[in-house]
Amino acid sequence: MSSILEVKNLHKSYQNFKAVDDISFHVNKGDIYGFLGPNGAGKSTTLRMILGLIKPDSGLIQLDGGRVDYSNKKYLNQIGALIERPDFYKNLSAYENLKILYSMSKLKDIRIIDDVLNEVDLLDRKKDKVGGYSQGMKQRLGIAQALMHQPSLIILDEPSNGLDPQGQADMRELILKINTERRITVVISSHILSEIEKISNRMIVINKGRKVAEGEVNQLMSSDSIKIQIKTDSHTAIENYCKTHQIPFTNENESYYLQWEEAKINELIKSLNSENISLYEVRQLKTLEEYFLNLTN
C-alpha cells in the first residue's frame, strides 16, 4: 500500500531540550494511524511540524511523495487539522464561524458549509451560538472546519480530550465514518490507550521525543515485547546495535525497551552477547497497556 505521509529523521529542540529526537514513520493511504504517548512525549510538536505551524530543525516531511512546501496553500489544503481544544468565536453561530473561514479561502461553493456540518451532525444546530455548545460539539465543529477543503489527510490532536465515555464513543464513530465514507486518511494523537486500540489499524509509540515502537496495532498487542536491562556501561554499543538493525528503543535508567519476536529472543541475546553487551534481565510484556506503560514510564 502506498504512503500518503512520510516523516524521516525529524528533529526539533528548544535550547537544550530535545522535543523531537530523530523520529521517522510513514502513514499509508486509508490508514487510521494512532499517535500514542504520554503528555509531553512530543506528539503535538511532531504534528505541528507536519502542519507547518512549527519549523523543524532538520528532517524530511513528504506528502504524497513530494517534499512539503509550507508556502504553498495547495499543499496546506491537502491536510485538515483539529488542534486540541479548538477555539471559535463564542458569540457567533457554527455556520457564521465556518463562513469566516470560507470567505478567506478560494472555495467557490458555499454549500460546503452545510455539507461538513451535516457530516458531524451539527446541521440542525448551525444557527446556535458556539458559546452554548458542549465540549463534544466544539470538537465536532473543529472536525467540520478540518473538512472544509476536502483534504486527503486529517490530523486530530486529542479529539476525545475532555469528553465523557459516550462522547468518546461518538467521536470514534465519527472518525470511522470520515475514514470509510470520505476515504480520508486519519492521524489521531492520543494518550488514551483504549481510543487508539479501538480505532487505529497502525500506530506509533513515542516517549521523550523518540520513537519506541511502530506497527500494526494487533501485531503490537499480540507480539512479545521485551525489556532489556544492561549490566555494563556499554550504552553506546546497544544504541548503535538498535539503530543498525532498525529496532526502535528508549533508554530509561540503564534499561532499554524494544519490540521483538518471542521465537527469536535467544537469537537476539546471542547477537547482543557477540557485541559484548551483557544482559541480566529479559522480560516479556504481553498487553498493549503493559507494553505502553513499560515503554513510557
Regions found by a protein language model. Give the residues of each.
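Generic alpha-helical secondary structure
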Residues: 72, 235, 262-265
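Positions that flank functional sites
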Residues: 132, 257, 287
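Generic beta-strand hydrophobic packing signal
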Residues: 10, 23, 280-282
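Primarily ABC-family ATPase nucleotide-binding module
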Residues: 1-3
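ABC transporter nucleotide-binding domain
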Residues: 172-259
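C-terminal coupling/interaction segments
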Residues: 260-297
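Surface-exposed charge patches
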Residues: 100, 115, 240, 270, ...
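ABC transporter nucleotide-binding domains
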Residues: 5, 12-188, 193-201, 205-207, ...
